[in-house]
């Protein structure tokens, strides 16, 4: 049986057997619904259920909910059988606390009785997915942006940075902007997210964005209840916030400048391999015009440091950026488990959860 690869994001959990040139067989909401104190499946139709988020801004926060979610994924979704569990490779977010790593390995060995475990950081795995071991990843997730330089398969943690904004924050911004221009229409956040996915885009540059504030074509969208909503400059504001964080009320540099500053803190002998191997990942990077805007901002850098993007190999699945860490995990699983580089049950029984820091790095 192939090892299972899991990448649990704040919005979506990606899981499947380690087949590198295929998309993960399960891509499901991480958020769960709770009814009568019992966790139901993520797609429960109940209208009265409360929701719980096992993962918040990349890190596991609700371990009971995570256990329920993993049980559904492994046994119901992927067909594991009790007492015949297999191996798991987990994609770790940047800067995962040691205590979280230990609790995860404890959960998997003691509750799920896995036969083997390995974890690697998402930044490293995303590079593996495009055939690189060195480079810099810009991962725009649902609840955070991680920028991480990686040299020879090792994340440079001192230089790495997490920015506490993500797709969810852009959705809230879009909701606020739509409410200003459509004050009589009430939208729930799930409707706003669908509208964002359909209409949000990036202007060509800051000058082009300023022009949209003065004049912008109007889109008319009919909602399921028959109401018609007007969408104009709001769709550009969402993308612009990544390059002008002041739109979100943040005193921070734009995405490309953040990347350049991070690379500049790494030894100059590594600048070139980091610059020439910049990888964009996360669902938000598929926003219309985002990649072009990123490249234009990079070309305008006054610094000698000018990032260039790595394209996904043609043989990789479409929309690779949405689950590149999972694909990289599938590639790595083909190495670590056959070569016995993983944590075995015997390793865990001998050393306990702390073995994860010695065997997975």
Please state what every model-predicted region is.
Residues 92-100, 108, 200, 204, ...:
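Glycine-rich phosphate-binding loops at beta-strand->alpha-helix junctions
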Residues 151-252, 277:
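Phosphate-binding glycine-rich/basic clefts of nucleotide- and phosphate-handling proteins
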Residues 69-77, 237, 241-274, 293:
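Phosphate/ATP-binding catalytic cores across multiple sugar-kinase/actin-like superfamilies
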Residues 185-197, 201-218, 307-361:
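Acidic, glycine/GT-rich loop-and beta-edge segments that sit at the periphery of enzyme/chaperone cores
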Residues 269, 279, 287-311, 334, ...:
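Catalytic phosphate/nucleotide-handling subdomain of diverse soluble enzymes
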Residues 2-107, 116, 146, 157-159, ...:
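Conserved phosphate-binding loops in N-terminal lobes of ATP-dependent enzymes
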Residues 3, 114-138, 180, 328:
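Conserved phosphate-binding catalytic cores of ATP/NTP-utilizing and phosphoryl-transfer enzymes
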Residues 6-12, 130-132, 137-145, 150-154, ...:
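A short acidic Gly-Thr/Ser loop motif
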């Amino acid at each position: 049986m192939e090892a299972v690869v899991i990448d649990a994001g704040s919005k979506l959990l990606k899981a499947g057997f380690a087949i590198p040139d295929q998309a993960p067989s399960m891509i499901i909401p991480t958020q769960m619904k709770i009814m009568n104190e019992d966790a139901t499946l993520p797609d429960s139709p109940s209208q009265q259920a409360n929701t719980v988020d096992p993962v918040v801004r990349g890190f596991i926060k609700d371990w009971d909910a995570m256990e329920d979610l993993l049980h559904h994924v492994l046994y119901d979704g992927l067909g594991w059988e009790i007492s015949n569990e297999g191996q798991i490779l987990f994609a770790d977010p940047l800067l995962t606390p040691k205590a979280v790593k230990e609790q995860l390995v404890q959960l998997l060995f003691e509750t799920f009785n896995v036969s083997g475990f390995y974890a690697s950081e998402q930044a490293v795995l995303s590079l593996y997915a495009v055939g690189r071991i060195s480079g810099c990843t810009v991962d725009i997730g649902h609840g955070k942006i991680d920028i991480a330089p990686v040299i020879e398969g090792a994340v440079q943690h001192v230089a790495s940075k997490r920015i506490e904004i993500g797709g969810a924050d852009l959705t809230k911004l879009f909701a606020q902007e739509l409410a200003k221009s459509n004050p009589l229409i009430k939208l729930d956040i799930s409707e706003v997210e669908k509208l964002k996915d359909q209409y949000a885009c990036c202007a060509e540059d800051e000058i082009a964005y300023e022009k949209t504030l003065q004049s912008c074509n109007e889109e008319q969208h009919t909602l399921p209840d028959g109401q018609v909503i007007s969408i104009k400059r709001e769709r550009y504001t969402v993308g612009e916030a990544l390059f002008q964080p002041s739109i979100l009320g943040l005193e921070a540099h734009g995405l490309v400048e953040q990347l350049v500053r991070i690379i500049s803190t790494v030894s100059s002998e590594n600048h070139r391999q980091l610059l020439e191997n910049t990888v964009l990942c996360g669902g938000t990077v598929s926003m219309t015009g985002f990649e072009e805007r990123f490249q234009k901002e990079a070309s305008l850098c006054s610094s000698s440091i000018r990032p260039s993007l790595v394209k996904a190999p043609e043989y990789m699945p479409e929309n690779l950026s949405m689950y590149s860490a999972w694909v990289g995990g599938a590639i790595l699983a083909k190495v670590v488990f056959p070569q016995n580089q993983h944590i075995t049950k015997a390793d865990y029984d001998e050393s306990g959860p702390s073995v994860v820091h010695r065997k997975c790095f």
